[in-house]
């Protein structure tokens, strides 16, 4: 099993690479790429950790060597948010980065499962899809927007609010991966009830959690460590699915035939072909239904922005 991380010298990329080095199955290969010249050194640093995961690092303009034979590609390359920016402000720089990297994936590892971490995810996933279509290798079951950070934040905040063991808390999150498009389905959390005020407050906190981190870091970065953990969880789930493990379910932003938008985050079953099944997200509360319907114009505009960028 070979996993490639593109953007591996950045804050998310280094955190993700560390976690994958310690958690990938024995015998796996971890391939790190970044434009930054430090990247081979990051690989050497990680190679001193005593796990049976082989690490190689590649730097420069061309990621081809890092991508050869990759089963999973996780893309975190791009610029990070600064105070006063929202995820859409990142578009002008990150759109081109994602386009160029996915073009290389299409040429080098067209069957790989691709997880897009680079923001704005609502738009960058649409860019990736158009690039893969243009290359004639698009498979909607092999492209994912990684929204796992919204899920782990939801689990953490619900557990804190209700005094629960966070390991027992499961919160599906649907929609997209920015602002109002992030919709935690708190009505589906088992064994706990919320007042209307709690639902509104928790939903808003989950939607704005990225900004909470950006502001707390006072210009020194965005959510890199928690995002690294979220991306590792999702990447390991992709690997487990590829290895044939049953009942691997994660929420992800996919082209899954949703009635709501071309791309929509919802629970999916992961397997040897990527998405094996898109699961219905089930019954929602009136609050959630209203929030879902209210987000759709924003989500569809984000998607169209990505389509138009490639055309």
UniProtKB/Swiss-Prot annotation:
One of its GO terms (molecular function) is L-malate dehydrogenase (NAD+) activity. NAD(+) binds at residues 7-13, 34, 94, 117-119, 227. Keywords: NAD, Oxidoreductase, Tricarboxylic acid cycle. Substrate binds at residues 81, 87, 119, 153. CDD domains: MDH_glyoxysomal_mitochondrial (cd01337). It catalyses: (S)-malate + NAD(+) = oxaloacetate + NADH + H(+). Its EC number is 1.1.1.37. GO terms for biological process: malate metabolic process; tricarboxylic acid cycle. One of its GO terms (cellular component) is cytoplasm. The active site is at residue 177. It holds the Pfam family Ldh_1_C. PANTHER family: MALATE AND LACTATE DEHYDROGENASE, MALATE DEHYDROGENASE, MITOCHONDRIAL. Belongs to the LDH/MDH superfamily. MDH type 1 family. Homodimer. Catalyzes the reversible oxidation of malate to oxaloacetate. This is Malate dehydrogenase. It comes from Shewanella pealeana (strain ATCC 700345 / ANG-SQ1).
């Amino acid at each position: 099993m070979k996993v490639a991380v593109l953007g591996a010298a950045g804050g998310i990329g280094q955190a993700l690479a560390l976690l994958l080095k310690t958690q990938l199955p024995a015998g796996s290969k971890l391939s790190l790429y970044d434009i930054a010249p430090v990247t081979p050194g990051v690989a050497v640093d990680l190679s001193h950790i005593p796990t049976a995961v082989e690490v190689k690092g590649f730097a420069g303009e061309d990621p081809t060597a890092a991508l050869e034979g990759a089963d999973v590609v996780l893309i975190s390359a791009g610029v990070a948010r600064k105070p006063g920016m929202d995820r859409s402000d990142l578009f002008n720089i990150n759109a081109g980065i994602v386009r160029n990297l996915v073009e290389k994936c299409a040429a080098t590892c067209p069957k790989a499962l691709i997880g897009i971490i680079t923001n704005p995810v609502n738009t960058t996933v649409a860019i990736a899809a158009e690039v893969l279509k243009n290359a004639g290798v698009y498979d909607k079951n092999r492209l994912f927007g990684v929204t796992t950070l919204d899920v782990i934040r939801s689990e953490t905040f619900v557990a804190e609010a209700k005094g629960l063991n966070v390991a027992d808390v499961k919160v599906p999150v649907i929609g997209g991966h920015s602002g109002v498009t992030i919709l935690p389905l708190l009505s589906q959390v088992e064994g706990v009830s919320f007042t209307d005020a709690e639902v509104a407050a928790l939903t808003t906190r989950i939607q704005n959690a990225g900004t909470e981190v950006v502001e707390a870091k006072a210009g020194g970065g965005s959510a890199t460590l928690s995002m690294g953990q979220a991306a590792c969880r999702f990447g390991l789930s992709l690997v487990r699915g590829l290895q044939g493990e049953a009942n691997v379910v994660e929420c992800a932003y996919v082209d899954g035939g949703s009635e709501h938008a071309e791309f929509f985050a919802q629970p999916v079953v992961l397997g040897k072909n990527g998405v094996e099944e898109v699961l219905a997200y089930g019954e929602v509360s009136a609050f959630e239904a209203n929030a879902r319907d209210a987000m759709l114009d924003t989500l569809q505009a984000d998607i169209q922005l990505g389509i138009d960028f490639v055309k």
